[in-house]
Amino acid sequence: MAKLVVVIQCDIVQKKCVGYACMKSFYERSGRFNGYDADTRYLTVTCGGCCGAGVAGKIEDLNRKLKRWGDDRKDVVIHLASCVVSDNYHRPPCPHRDYIKEIIERKGYPVI
């Protein structure tokens, strides 16, 4: 089971959204966060801006931090936030969501 859940938020939406609903869902273990252990940690980062290519650099930074702190990357799972994948009150789904998912998967992480 994952020990760290990383949530990728839309860079544009993040400028006006604090991510409270995502955080609340995580701590209540509702929706896509159902089933995570109580000691699972939570981290949010943005995609880096359109077209999402910046997420590659952010994942490389995450890899360096995991190594430095002795954490195993196999304990990390990445979620795409609702502002990226769904049509909601912020905006329509990100047109680059499949590209972002592909980058994350190429870096060896599961994407939810």
Predicted regions and their residues:
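Active-site nucleophile-His-acid catalytic modules used for acyl/amide transfer and hydrolysis
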Residues: 79-83, 88-89
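Structural motif
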Residues: 4-6, 76-79
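Acidic (Asp/Glu)-rich catalytic clusters
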Residues: 70-72
